[in-house]
A protein has these predicted regions:
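ABC transporter nucleotide-binding domains
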Residues: 9-16, 20, 26-177, 182-183, ...
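Flexible, glycine-rich phosphate/dinucleotide-binding loops
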Residues: 85, 207, 215-216, 284-287
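ABC transporter nucleotide-binding domain
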Residues: 169-252
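Short, charged/small-residue-rich alpha-helical element at the C-terminal edge
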Residues: 220-292
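Generic C-terminal helix-cap and adjacent flexible tail
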Residues: 293-301
């Protein structure tokens, strides 16, 4: 199990993250979504052990970076950037270097090359690679480590639809092997198809956790005009899957059982004057993103 706790994290006087508590069981694919510059990459770097302070804790099966640094680094890998690649080396040399660092057998390198369909160009120098080829190599370097936790920041960047489909297939197979995979991405429809859960980062914290299975469920969004009714509702229906949206009086509820909906609507009928808006339907990552980050854009110049 991976546990991440961040009381606060700042760059100088600028606070970037606070009050973040995440618990992830194996195996799982987690999507991480937020606009640029709001802390996604910082969170990835913290999980990778590249950023730290006294208010940060990352535990993998009760081990941490402070007391088990090398072991954690062998078990958690972050995808490198294309700028980290060496132009004068071949893709195969990159993979062999990573395999040696993680004590991986050469046969597994060949397996990764085959799985990612890179044989045609893997022995060429990286300087000859297209953007998509470089991105696939960066992903292959993660896969070849065979780490338990894989951190991917915009892994689909620069890839055509065929390659997005290929990498998505590999990600699913890695999950089936028992991995935890965390993907920071703007391709929301892709996350809809591969992620078990998607974390939406807003106002320096995880504002909403959306489970993939919720796409098969009805969702009810309620905005309360009365704080007292909001508290009363959350107490009465505390066993339901609820997420706070853009303010403390706005809830997103996922329902599998229509009987749950009946009981909620009965409550709503008795308290209708204290509810300012009500939306019912099926949501996906794209709709949730728009509501979280652009719900107040209407009417602006």
């Amino acid at each position: 199990m991976l546990n991440i706790s961040i009381s606060k994290f700042s760059y100088g006087k600028k606070e970037v993250l606070n009050d973040i508590h995440i618990q992830i069981e194996k195996p799982k694919i987690i999507g991480l979504v937020a606009p640029n510059g709001t802390g996604k990459s910082t969170l990835i770097e913290i999980i990778a052990g590249n950023l730290n302070n006294r208010d940060v804790s990352v535990l993998l099966d009760d081990k941490n970076y402070k007391n088990h640094y090398l072991d954690m680094k062998r078990r958690i890998v972050r995808m490198c950037n294309q700028d980290d690649l060496y132009s004068d080396l071949t893709g195969l040399q990159h993979l062999q270097f990573y395999a040696e660092m993680w004590n991986i057998k050469p046969a597994f390198v060949d397996e990764v090359v085959s799985k990612l369909q890179m044989a045609e160009y893997i022995s060429n120098k990286v300087s000859s690679y297209s953007l998509g080829m470089k991105q696939r190599l960066c992903f292959a370097l993660v896969v070849v480590t065979n780490c338990e936790v894989m951190l991917l920041d915009e892994v689909m960047n620069g890839l055509d639809p065929d390659n997005v489909q290929l990498i998505s297939k590999v990600l699913r197979s890695l999950k089936n092997e028992g991995k935890i995979i965390i993907i920071a991405s703007h391709l929301l429809n892709n996350l809809n198809s591969i992620a078990d859960e998607v974390f939406f980062l807003k106002d320096k914290r995880i504002a909403l956790k959306y489970q993939l299975e919720d796409q098969c469920n009805q969702s009810l969004e309620i905005q309360f005009s009365s704080v007292d009714r909001y508290k009363e509702f959350t107490q009465q229906f505390m066993n339901m899957n609820m997420n706070i949206l853009s303010n403390p009086s706005e809830l997103l509820i996922s329902m599998k059982d229509l009987n749950e909906l009946d009981s909620i609507f009965l409550w709503i009928q008795s308290n209708l004057k204290d509810i300012s808006s009500l939306t019912y339907g099926i949501k996906g990552c794209e709709i949730i993103y728009q509501e979280l980050f652009h719900s107040n854009d209407e009417g602006r110049e």
